[in-house]
Amino acid sequence: MDQTKVKAILDWPEPKNVKGVRSFLGRANFYRRFIKDYACIARPLHDLIEKEEPFQWEEPQQTALDTLKRHFTTTLVLTFPDLDCKFHLESDASDYAIGAVLSIKKDGIWHPVAFSSHSMMPQERNYPVADKEMLSVIQALEQWRHYLEGARHQFEI
């Protein structure tokens, strides 16, 4: 990883206003597919720009910023999807976000292919737990349909 880029990310200043948070999230959203549970991690930052309240940077926002910076500067190796390998889809839901990881089994080891993470709409946050979990499965199946329908083996959920 290019050390000048790593330094630029690590030196990213604490946002002083909503515009600064939007700027950071704009860059962060590009890499969301490489970060497990991105929506949960970034939630405090999104809450800050969505609220009609005065800008107030607190511990949850700082933790989210620091966690995202750490993820951006840590090399995570995703593998290419191989339709000859067995796929595994793992999903989860929290009170406000859904997420999933698609993996393949190579040489007896599961390797991540992609991550998915989305914030739930306000009405979806009212769903019962089982419905939230099913929503995460449906969203993941829709997102990775092109891999799973072409797979030569059955896939696991």
Q: Model features per residue range: what roles?
A:
Residues 1-85:
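C-terminal reverse transcriptase regions that engage the nucleic-acid substrate
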Residues 28-31, 133-151:
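Metal-dependent nuclease catalytic cores in nucleic-acid-processing enzymes
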Residues 40-48, 146-157:
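Substrate-binding beta-hairpin/strand module that engages nucleic acids
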Residues 76, 83-105:
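Conserved beta-strand/loop block within the catalytic cores
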Residues 83-86, 110, 149-155:
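Short amphipathic alpha-helical interface segments
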Residues 106-135, 139, 152:
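A short, polar/acidic, helix/strand-boundary loop motif
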